Amino acid sequence: MDLDFRVLVVLLPVLLAGGWALKNILPAALRQVQSFFSK
């Protein structure tokens, strides 16, 4: 059980950082994709 807890403690900051990065990057990425397809 404590192995699962340690894995969660390790993954939680990674997931939070990934979610934060996606939240910041996604709008710009969507604009790039839209401009790519509108050519």
UniProtKB/Swiss-Prot annotation:
Pfam families: PsbY (PF06298). GO terms for cellular component: photosystem II; plasma membrane-derived thylakoid membrane. One of its GO terms (biological process) is photosynthesis. It is found in: Cellular thylakoid membrane. Its main location: membrane. The keyword Membrane applies. It is a single-pass membrane protein. GO terms for molecular function: manganese ion binding. The chain crosses the membrane at residues 7-25. Keywords: Membrane, Photosynthesis, Photosystem II, Thylakoid, Transmembrane, Transmembrane helix. Belongs to the PsbY family. Loosely associated component of the core of photosystem II (PSII), it is not always seen in crystals. PSII is a light-driven water plastoquinone oxidoreductase, using light energy to abstract electrons from H(2)O, generating a proton gradient subsequently used for ATP formation. PSII is composed of 1 copy each of membrane proteins PsbA, PsbB, PsbC, PsbD, PsbE, PsbF, PsbH, PsbI, PsbJ, PsbK, PsbL, PsbM, PsbT, PsbX, PsbY, PsbZ, Psb30/Ycf12, peripheral proteins PsbO, CyanoQ (PsbQ), PsbU, PsbV and a large number of cofactors. It forms dimeric complexes. HAMAP family: PSII_PsbY (MF_00717). This is Photosystem II reaction center protein Y.
